[in-house]
Amino acid sequence: MSYAGDITPQQAWELLSENPEAVLVDVRTDAEWRFVGVPDLSGLGRDVVYIEWNRTDGKRNDNFVTELLDHVPARADRPVVFLCRSGNRSIGAAEAATEAGIAPSYNVLDGFEGHLDQDGHRGGSGWRAIGLPWKQS
């Protein structure tokens, strides 16, 4: 079973803004949340769900689905949007969520920081780069 598809950061924001049932799950590591920043949904009166897909040491979080189900019980009518650094880890998270009955599950293209540019830097695309709400902790 495949996830619902890829959406841009702007489409993710619109979905979250228009559907009060929609959930944003940030699957980056704790270090990324603390040192890079996080999406800010306070303007929508909601919180982001934070669950690591991989641990800081790069090992897969074997409890990901269990932790996800604790925060987002399986329903077939609640859109769940998965965000990582650049839109790669969140694909695996969206696939795992879909297999667990959490659907529709979407991957955010370009993630929070975007892909590397020709100079090896991130930040030219993604949630933060297009000016969507975010904060540093």
List each model region and its residues.
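Rhodanese-like catalytic fold shared by cysteine-dependent sulfurtransferases
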Residues: 1-23, 30-79, 90-137
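Short, surface-exposed ligand- or partner-binding patches at beta-edge/loop junctions that are enriched
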Residues: 83
